[in-house]
Curated annotation (Swiss-Prot):
Residue ranges of domain HD in the record: 339-432
Superkingdom as given in the UniProt entry: Bacteria
Lineage: Bacteria, Pseudomonadati, Bdellovibrionota, Bdellovibrionia, Bdellovibrionales
InterPro entries found in the cross-reference section: HD/PDEase_dom, HD_domain, HDIG_dom, Ribonuclease_Y, RNase_Y_N
Keyword set, alphabetical order: Cell membrane, Endonuclease, Hydrolase, Membrane, Nuclease, RNA-binding, Transmembrane, Transmembrane helix
A GO molecular function held by the record: RNA endonuclease activity
Gene name, Swiss-Prot/TrEMBL: rny2
GO cellular component, one term: plasma membrane
Subcellular location: Cell membrane
Free-text function comment from the UniProt entry: Endoribonuclease that initiates mRNA decay.
EC identifiers of the protein: 3.1.-.-
Protein name: Ribonuclease Y 2
Length: 527
């Protein structure tokens, strides 16, 4: 059994080794055959590649020959052009060299000419120096001879000549200024007269001159006795209720009213008239009741007057306090001219002039009406009425240009707008028209005295006369001390001094009169 198994094992091992040997043999044989076949294929491929390379080289040679055949004629032509261009360049270079040589020659010739001119110039400069020295010596000799002949030094002569030339220049300038002023004034005055004549013709506002009443007459002796009680309680009651002083003189049949506030004076006057009309038992309680009723009625009238004036001038947006103050001007007078009607006149005149000049008409009327509003409160506030009024309307919303025109209408500040100058002109027209204003003898004498003192304070003035109701100042001067040019300058200085120191309505004409009187006596004796 074991032998059989061993025999089987040996057979299996021997069969396996034989199989492995056969497998290895056939594998080696297959690899050899594959290598031989691959080598054959590689050889064939190399032969094909070599053949193709040969064909490609032949094709390239053919293409090169074909291209050379086409390009060769063009290359030959290009070579011919290059030769032509080279010849042209050579010719141009030769010409340029010739031009350069010619310019060098010209430059050399010019340099030679310059040297010759420099030498000539040096000679002329030397000769000029000699001439200057000769001229200097001649001038010195001339100055010396003139000095000896005139008897003064050169500096003194120069000073005299300078002064003469300055004086002549001043005279010419003064003459030119005079001619220019005459032409300007002639044109300006004619245009102003034309506009004013049109405005005055178009303005026909009704006006009745009136005067403020400062006294109330007693109806009879009985009323006087009732009012003037021994203790003076009635008079004191009127003074306390109305704010004005009551003046009752023995033997006078009237009651005087004194006070700085025109509205309070009017209230006092109305209260007294009402008390005297009642003819009842007059006592302090009755007086206070009458005064209160009259105060309400007066303020109602003031408001109505302010509203009426604003409505008449077609002004809108006016503050209620402004209208109230305008109404209070109904009882304010300046040089006997009622300021309520004066403001209305100025408003209309300013509007008409604005229409002629193409300026805002409504604003001109507004400024004209408001220009003297400060007079309604100048008794309670310090300062000029123009400044007071301007501050008042500025605090109540008026435009800056309106405020400026009100403030500048008496030159409290320099006017700089058209409306400011319009108000100045309209104010002058309203105040200077005949019958508008009157002055007392005391104020007139004071005005005359001030004008004469101002005119006589200037050197050369011999006398002064005030004419035309204080609207003309005629100044007489010494003809030996003041010439024509100085007379013209003197008139301007006097006018400027009057504007600066005096405050009067309207304009004042200054006339300077220079008189030259020449006399000669005959020497021949009569037979």
């Amino acid at each position: 059994m074991i032998a059989m198994i061993a025999t089987a094992i040996i057979g299996i091992v021997a069969g396996g080794g034989l199989g492995w040997a056969l497998h290895k043999f056939f594998r080696a044989r297959t690899l050899r055959l594959a290598r031989e076949e691959a080598q054959d294929i590689l050889d064939e491929a190399n032969e094909v590649v070599e053949l193709r390379n040969l064909e490609e080289r032949e094709r390239i040679q053919e293409i090169e020959m074909e291209l050379w055949t086409k390009v060769e004629p063009e290359m030959l032509k290009s070579e011919g052009r290059i030769e032509d261009l080279q010849e042209v360049a050579n010719e141009r270079k030769a010409k340029a060299d010739a031009i350069v040589q010619e310019e060098k020659k010209k430059l050399q010739d010019r340099e030679a000419d310059v040297k010759v001119q420099e030498q000539a110039l040096r000679g002329q400069e030397a000769e000029l120096g000699k001439l200057k020295e000769a001229q200097k010596a001649l001038n010195q000799e001339l100055v010396q001879k003139l000095t000896e002949r005139l008897g003064t030094s050169a500096e003194e002569f120069k000073t005299q000549l300078k002064n003469q030339m300055e004086e002549e220049s001043r005279r010419r300038a003064a003459r030119m200024i005079q001619e220019t002023e005459a032409d300007t004034k002639e044109h300006a005055e004619s245009e102003a007269k034309r506009i004013l004549s049109l405005v005055i013709d178009r303005f026909a506002r009704p006006y009745c001159a009136e005067r403020g009443i400062g006294a109330v007459n007693f109806p009879d002796a009985h009323i006087r006795k009732l009012f003037c009680d021994p203790a003076g309680n009635n008079i004191k009651a009127v003074q306390d209720a109305c704010g004005c002083d009551i003046i009752v003189e023995e033997g006078m049949e009237m009651v005087g009213v004194a006070g700085f506030d025109p509205v309070r004076r009017e209230l006092t006057r109305r209260t007294l008239e009402r008390i005297f009309k009642e003819k009842k038992n007059i006592n302090p309680d009755f007086i206070r009741k009458i005064a209160e009723n009259q105060k309400k009625e007066l303020f109602k009238n003031i408001k109505h007057d302010g509203d009426s004036l604003a409505k008449e001038l077609k002004l809108e947006g006016l503050n209620a306090e402004i209208r109230q103050m305008m109404g209070s001007l109904r009882y304010r007078y300046s040089f006997t001219q009622n300021q309520y009607f004066h403001c209305g006149e100025v408003g209309w005149l300013a509007g008409l002039m604005a229409a002629e000049l193409g300026i805002d008409i409504k604003k001109a009327r507004r400024v004209g009406m408001l220009h003297d509003i400060g007079k309604s409160m100048d008794h309670t506030v310090e300062g000029g009425h123009a400044v007071i009024g301007a501050d008042f309307i500025a605090a109540r919303g008026e435009a800056p240009d309106v405020v400026h025109a009100v403030k500048a209408h008496h030159f409290d500040e320099q006017p700089s707008t058209d409306h400011a100058f319009l108000v100045i002109a309209a104010d002058a027209v309203s105040g200077a028209r005949p019958g508008a204003r009157r002055s007392t003898i005391e104020s007139y004498n004071q005005k005359v005295s001030e004008l004469q003192d101002i005119a006589r304070s200037f050197p050369g003035v011999t006398d002064c006369f005030v004419l035309s109701g204080g609207r003309e100042c005629r100044v007489m001067v010494n003809g030996k001390k003041v010439d024509d040019t100085q007379a013209m300058d003197l008139s301007r200085k006097i006018a400027a001094r009057i504007e600066e120191e005096c405050n009067y309505p309207g304009s004042i004409k200054v006339v300077v009169v220079r008189e030259t009187v020449v006399t000669e006596q005959t020497r021949k004796e009569l037979a």
